[in-house]
Design a protein with these regions (language model features):
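Bacterial N-terminal signal peptides that target proteins for export
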Residues: 3-14
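Coiled-coil-like amphipathic alpha-helices with heptad-repeat character
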Residues: 3-5, 20, 34
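Bacterial N-terminal signal peptides
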Residues: 13-23
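Phosphate-group recognition and catalysis centered on beta-loop-alpha active-site segments
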Residues: 27-412
């Protein structure tokens, strides 16, 4: 299919990727070996679509190859601390062809991989170190109806200080009375003993690692949570420029990079000022979460005319139920495709699909009758919507699907 980019020419079966894992983890906290088939087969057991279930299960013994259709969302956070070295290696071992670093900056303007500029309180061990004294808002225990909280930002500390911290699972207990209670351990369905001290990464280090793993890059320029310019001359444009300059400095071909942002101004800045990266700029479109938003083919056509090729809405913007309760492409999905835009979507394997509070499945909630129904969602996204890639918190499941049902094991 045209939207599946096969890395087979430069890749090996996943068993070889596991050997890469072993080599790259020498001297690093040991991570549990991952099996890309196990999770997919577990989910297939509760998949209502029997034809799809049997087809997926028939592929269990096949070779599995990396694919750009499988995009690692922050690494592999269903089992590893997000944006950790260990999580990135696990994602590559699961066949993710593209790996994400969410990019923000430290007090001394070093670019680092964090989902948010101010998430260190829950995604690192900073509250358990002397650096807690530098946090924007120190730990405050739960008190009556007031939940426990803390705010620690990358801009509170230097790069050298950032590198002393551990990456930890982004789980917290808002009823906690102490820091130890606040930093709740991860309960993972895929890793028996989740890491408690993963290795934090700078953006440059992530480039070096992902390049060594033979994968592509999708850095997201995170919205600053400080006033810009943060220092004289370091305005939003300089920040956006610095992200791309780190790929040039590392000698990475622009064709391997998919820079992303929720801020359309960042996208137009890249398109207008960095033509070598323009074709693969990805706009993360969250407009569908606004009350009353209505998409239109004319709007999508105008975006493409301005130079946008790839749009990346969340899954609920692409899915709907028809009159008989079947999952089908949404109006948004049909319009975007008819306007000629390519689509990437997020985030697969994020949260319980049967939880009514999980907004990722809100438009199709009544159809989500089992955990395995996620595979039906993936099937619709791949075949009916025609997305070119899916972000996943456990990319092995998407890799398995792509190898089994999208022709990866056939010669081109």
């Amino acid at each position: 299919m045209h939207y599946l980019q096969n890395n087979r020419a430069k890749s090996a079966p996943l068993i070889l990727c596991l050997l890469i894992v072993s080599a790259l983890q020498a001297g690093v906290t040991e991570a549990e070996i991952v099996d890309p088939t196990k999770r997919a087969l577990h989910l297939s057991e509760t998949l209502p679509n029997q034809t799809l279930k049997e087809h997926l299960q028939s592929c269990a013994l096949g070779d599995f190859y990396p694919t750009d259709f499988s995009i690692a969302h922050r690494g592999a956070p269903l089992g590893y601390p997000e944006h950790s070295r260990e999580g990135y290696i696990a994602a590559a071992a699961q066949g993710a062809g593209v790996i994400e670093c969410d990019v923000t900056f430290t007090q001394d303007l070093a670019l680092v991989c964090r989902h948010s500029q101010c998430d260190l309180a829950t995604t690192t061990n900073i509250l358990q170190t002397p650096l807690a004294a530098k946090c924007s808002k120190p730990f405050r225990p739960a008190n009556g109806h007031q939940p426990a909280s803390a705010t620690c930002c990358t801009t509170d500390i230097s790069l050298a200080e950032f590198k002393t911290l551990c990456a930890r699972p982004a789980y917290s207990n808002n009823q906690a009375k102490t820091v130890a209670q606040y930093l709740a351990p991860q309960r993972s369905p895929v890793v028996s003993a989740p890491l408690t001290c993963g290795t934090l990464m700078t953006h440059a280090e992530s480039i070096e690692l992902i390049d060594a793993l033979g994968r592509k890059f999708t850095p997201e320029l995170k919205q600053p949570m400080v006033d810009m310019p943060f220092t004289p001359g370091f305005n939003q444009g300089a920040y956006a420029d610095k992200l791309l300059e780190e790929y040039r400095a590392a000698g990475i071909a622009p064709s391997r990079v998919y820079p992303q942002s929720f801020n359309p101004d960042d996208i137009w800045h890249w398109i207008n000022n960095h033509p070598d990266f323009a074709d693969q700029a990805v706009w993360l479109d969250a407009r569908g979460r606004r009350p009353g938003f209505q998409s239109s083919t004319a709007d999508f056509a105008a975006l493409q005319k301005q130079g946008l090729n790839i749009i990346a809405p969340p899954m609920p913007m692409l899915l709907a139920l028809n009159d008989v309760g079947k999952i089908v492409p949404s109006t948004y999905a049909r319009q975007a495709k008819s306007a000629g835009l390519e689509i990437i979507t997020w985030t697969f394997e994020a949260g319980d699909p049967m939880d009514e509070k999980n907004w990722l499945y809100a438009p199709i909630a009544t159809a989500m009758t089992s955990e395995g129904q996620m595979l039906q969602v993936l099937h619709v996204l791949a075949n009916d919507v025609g997305v070119r890639g899916v972000f996943s918190d456990w990319p092995g499941t998407v890799t398995y699907y792509a190898n089994c049902l999208m022709g990866l094991n056939r010669q081109n």
